[in-house]
């Protein structure tokens, strides 16, 4: 008799637990259908009031680095030809660039091509002349090219309007030379001068589908 009573008691307790779970599921379903008009309290019942509104900021992911930026990214990047010989070191604001390429030039020297897109520093330099393959890089990124001087072939290439460019040899932008380095390793330009030229030419009016990279998530 005692064993039978225990089994009966166990069945009753099980039914009671199932009924409680079912009731909680029904209450949760009603709360969801109600559109979050009330928030369930831990102790039972509901707390009146609407759920808080969360505003998600407008962000954009750089196709060059995968970094997230608030607000809109520019229509196209800026590629700057940077000196890389001993007399030019240290260069200014290279850490602000999204990408930096190193290319060989004459005399066993190299030159840097800095790609700026997510952030633009106060000034750039020391700026040096261009070569045709620097222009090719700018075309790949649908960018704006900034340099001081050019080889004969690079001049012909740029003059054919393959990319928008700013060059100290034929621009109204104000380049300047710093006193702590010797020419030709001391040519600089301020970002406000570059931005003024970009705006006046309308180079940022049309968004470009620029070259992008794939990044691993997590």
Where do the PLM segments sit?
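Short, aromatic- and cysteine-enriched interfacial helices/patches
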Residues: 3, 18, 46-54
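Hydrophobic membrane-insertion alpha-helices, especially the h-region
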Residues: 24-37
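A surface/extracellular/periplasmic glyco- and lipid-processing/surface-interacting theme
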Residues: 49-101, 106-218
């Amino acid at each position: 008799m005692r064993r039978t009573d225990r089994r009966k008691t166990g069945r009753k307790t099980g039914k009671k637990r199932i009924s409680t779970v079912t009731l909680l599921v029904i209450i949760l379903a009603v709360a969801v259908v109600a559109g979050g008009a009330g928030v369930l309290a831990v102790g039972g019942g509901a707390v009146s009031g609407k759920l808080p509104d969360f505003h998600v900021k407008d962000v954009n992911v750089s196709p060059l680095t995968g970094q997230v930026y608030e607000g809109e990214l520019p229509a196209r990047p800026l590629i700057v030809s940077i000196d890389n010989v001993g007399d030019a070191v240290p260069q200014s604001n290279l850490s602000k660039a999204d990408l930096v390429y190193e290319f060989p030039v004459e005399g066993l020297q190299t030159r840097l091509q800095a790609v700026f897109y997510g952030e633009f520093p106060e000034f750039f330099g020391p700026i040096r002349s261009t070569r045709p393959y620097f222009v090719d890089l700018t075309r790949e990124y649908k960018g704006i090219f900034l340099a001081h001087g050019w080889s004969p072939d690079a001049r012909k290439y740029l003059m054919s309007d393959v990319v928008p460019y700013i060059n100290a040899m034929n621009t109204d932008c104000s380049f300047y030379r710093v006193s702590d380095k010797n020419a030709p390793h001391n040519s600089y330009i301020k970002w406000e001068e570059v931005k003024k030229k970009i705006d006046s030419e309308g180079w940022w009016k049309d968004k470009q589908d620029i070259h992008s990279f794939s990044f691993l998530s997590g």
